[in-house]
Curated annotation (Swiss-Prot):
Record pathway: Purine metabolism; AMP biosynthesis via de novo pathway; AMP from IMP: step 1/2
Name this polypeptide is given: Adenylosuccinate synthetase isozyme 2
Enzyme class, broadest EC rank: ligase
Residue pairs linked by disulfide bridges in the UniProt entry: none
Regulation: Inhibited competitively by AMP and IMP and non-competitively by fructose 1,6-bisphosphate.
Similarity section: Belongs to the adenylosuccinate synthetase family.
Chemical reaction(s) catalysed: IMP + L-aspartate + GTP = N(6)-(1,2-dicarboxyethyl)-AMP + GDP + phosphate + 2 H(+)
Gene Ontology terms: cellular component: cytoplasm; mitochondrion
Organism of derivation: Gallus gallus
The gene coding this protein: ADSS2
Binding residues annotated for substrate, in chain numbering: D35, V325, T326, T327, G328, R329, K330, R331
Known function: Plays an important role in the de novo pathway and in the salvage pathway of purine nucleotide biosynthesis. Catalyzes the first committed step in the biosynthesis of AMP from IMP.
């Protein structure tokens, strides 16, 4: 310690230099209300990745990946697991429904060879919380109550996501480490939690002993996959050079803090959720790619300023085959909203964008883009936090000429019609973020890379 007011040495302990930050992770996030095509971007990047991670959400997410003409659906697993060389990591911020996890693997194994050997390539954080069947049942009851009491529900996926994050925040939840450590102790805590739920929801039926029997069987299967997640990530970041990819679920406008509350999910699906959901510091975040559909869609209810509840919306819905992967619900469709995208950029600091489904706009003679919101005739400077205000905004549009050409066979930017190129450049200029990929179809080959 420095004496008599003398300055301390510049380097702590006189010679301990700061550690090198280690490997960077590449993050892929949804920039709208979900369903932007994140799985496709991840699939592209996962081809030479070493580790692919999920950091938040549960099996309420839905990612589709097409490999060798086989369409795989992922809800809980990182979709990058389709690469046989990849280690998939489910972080502590994810909530895990064990029956859902094994059902997902079985369904995908029947479709093709993409998931072979998955058990040896999956690591699950011991700090991840477990979704129980009664969480899912409670989710359904809560939705029913909202409908009866307020005349509208939140439109949840009924996958138990809200209730399990509630248990986590109330500190009554159970984690993977509890399941695989001492099953007797786990069983006692499970009974307490189940009885709490029965007290809150008298109509809820829980076969406690039956559930525990099933959970014990899952425990045997999952135990080899459960590891200390913090140590796993630290080793991955500070060991030999590795390409680490983080696959965000849901999207910016569904974030519990920054989304169109209350019509949101229950986790942080913006860039901050990467650090808290994996147990890693922000200096290890590298590229942050925002995935943007060339128009806008939303599942369920909630404000949607650029929605086209007309023939335009129907045409977008039909051409884009806009149905939710998890719920099968029709997606609401509308024009691209740059006010909303600027807001998503402010929170996430996207380093580049992936613009997907540009080919869906092929048939429109002119294309509108929302560039500002007005309230009582005045342009408002920010994306409103209040849902009622957002519901009332009037959108100011910029109209761009369409290209009336099938672009699905384009493989370079120069092969796109001039008006399609101008549409992409307009988005870049308005947002101040470069577009790195343009999607013009379903296959891997139909992602045009610009740089």
């Amino acid at each position: 310690m420095a004496e008599h007011g003398a300055p301390a040495p510049a380097i702590p302990n006189g010679g301990c230099a700061a550690r090198l930050p280690g490997n960077k992770v590449t993050v892929v996030l949804g920039a709208q209300w979900g369903d932007e095509g994140k799985g496709k971007v991840v699939d592209l990047l996962a081809q030479d990745a070493d580790i692919v991670c999920r950091c938040q959400g549960g099996n309420n997410a839905g990612h589709t990946v097409v490999v060798d003409s086989v369409e795989y659906d992922f809800h809980l697993l990182p979709s990058g697991i389709i690469n046989p060389k990849v280690t998939a990591f489910i972080g502590n911020g994810v909530v895990i429904h064990l029956p859902g996890l094994f059902e997902e693997t079985e369904k995908n194994l029947k479709k093709g060879k993409g998931l072979e050997g998955w058990e040896k390539r999956l690591v699950i954080s011991d700090r991840a919380h477990i979704v129980f069947d009664f969480h899912q049942a409670a989710d359904g009851i809560q939705e029913q109550q909202r409908q009866e009491q307020a005349g509208k529900n939140l439109g949840t996926t009924k996958k138990g996501i809200g209730p399990v994050y509630s248990s986590k925040a109330a500190r009554s939840g159970l984690r993977m480490c509890d399941l695989v450590s001492d099953f007797d102790e786990f069983s006692e805590r499970f009974k307490v939690l189940a009885n709490q739920y029965k007290a809150i929801y008298p109509t809820l039926e829980i076969d406690i002993e039956g559930e525990l029997k099933k959970l014990k069987a899952y425990m045997e299967k999952v135990k080899p996959m459960v590891k200390d997640g913090v140590y796993f990530m630290y080793e991955a970041l500070h060991g030999p050079p590795k390409k680490i990819l983080v696959e965000g679920a849901n999207a910016a406008l569904l974030d519990i803090d920054f989304g169109t509350y209350p019509f949101v999910t229950s986790s942080n699906c913006t860039v901050g959720g990467v650090c808290t959901g994996l147990g890693m510091p922000p200096q290890n975040v590298g590229e942050v790619y925002g995935v943007v559909k060339a128009y806008t869609t939303r599942v369920g209810i909630g404000a949607f300023p650029t929605e086209q509840d007309n023939e335009i919306g129907e045409l977008l819905q039909m051409r884009g085959k806009e149905f939710g992967v998890t719920t099968g619900r029709k997606r609401r469709c509308g024009w691209l909203d740059l006010v909303q995208l600027r807001y998503a950029y402010m929170i996430n600091g996207f380093t580049a964008l992936a613009l997907t489904k540009l080919d869906i706009l092929d048939v429109f003679p002119e294309i509108k883009v929302g560039v500002a919101y007005k309230l009582d005739g005045e342009v408002i400077p920010h994306f409103p936090a209040n849902h009622e205000v957002l519901s009332k905004v009037e959108v100011k549009y910029e109209t761009l000429p369409g290209w009336d050409t099938d672009i699905s066979n384009a493989r370079t930017f120069d092969e796109l019609p001039v008006n399609a190129q101008n549409y992409v450049r307009f988005i870049e200029m308005e947002l101040g973020v470069p577009v790195k990929w343009i999607g013009v179809g379903k296959s891997r080959e139909s992602m045009i890379q610009l740089f």
